[in-house]
Amino acid sequence: MAETKKTVRAAAAQIAPDLTSADGTTARVLETIREAARQGVELIVFPETFVPYYPYFSFVQPPVQQGPAHLLLMERAPTVPGPMTDAVSASAREAGMVVVLGVNERDHGSLYNTQLVFDADGALALKRRKITPTYHERMVWGQGDGSGLRTVATRVGRVGALACWEHYNPLARYALMAEHEEIHCAQFPGSLVGPIFADQMGVTIRHHALESGCFVVNATGWLHDDQVRAVTSDEKLQAALRGGCHSAIVSPEGKYLAEPLTEGEGLVIADLDLALIAKRKRMMDSVGHYARPELLSLAIRRDPATTTLALPCAGYPVTSESAAAGTEPEPEIPGPLRRGLHSPLGH
């Protein structure tokens, strides 16, 4: 891996998906990477679940009516890895750019809100799933696990990512801070709730930058008026699919490095001087000299979740020690089962 750069040109992409085609949205991603490369961008962040699109229908349609839209999203959702990730990987490699992309990942019969980090050589450095879908999203996505609550070393530095209201889970943010995150990649859907969502987002990302002493690159999506009408014909509900955009780049001192984009499509671009991280942490390092781990600490389960667990068979091998003692060996109880058991398993 190349030596970490001292200055990084970053971009937050606020663009509209293709609500009719996963390939169309992927083409928009590749086109935007090429455009960013022409402007010297070295890291780009796309909105939450941008491929094929955020499930806006789940916010404005009653659950009993969501079946057709939900099934269509499942049909269009990519697998990871798959043709979509191959295309983005090749584009990242060609541009020499770190790409952070949100997707609806299909894993057999379930969908997940998944964040992908491609390094500048095209390698998929991180795949993580949103640990708790928010409100209406629970009708669409499954829950992620703790295996992705980590940062990854990339050509531009240590990168971490969270999606939307995961930023209101302080322990999730602290997990990334504890791994000395340098560039935090935040993703929100955009075109949702209204201006209050954008205002809250600004407070949220600036607070994380200040508390963690890292840069934050935040990307939100955008819907055109015809797309809003395609999601719902109810004019009152259409108002819930406008506003809520706040693509921005924030320094470790909590300052905007470029004017946030709250309307329309475009790229927010800024140069990140990584020396500012040490300047900020010299005064307050929340996971270093300003921490009190003997008083307050975080426990994380990073083992991947699984729906099955292999158990030992009923007959346990007799060892020389147990034979000499005339006893049967105690079974090895797997950790996930051992937690919460009040007594050993019977023979």
Task: Cite the ranges covered by each PLM segment.
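Active-site-proximal beta-strand elements of phosphoester/diester hydrolases
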Residues: 7-19, 114, 127, 151, ...
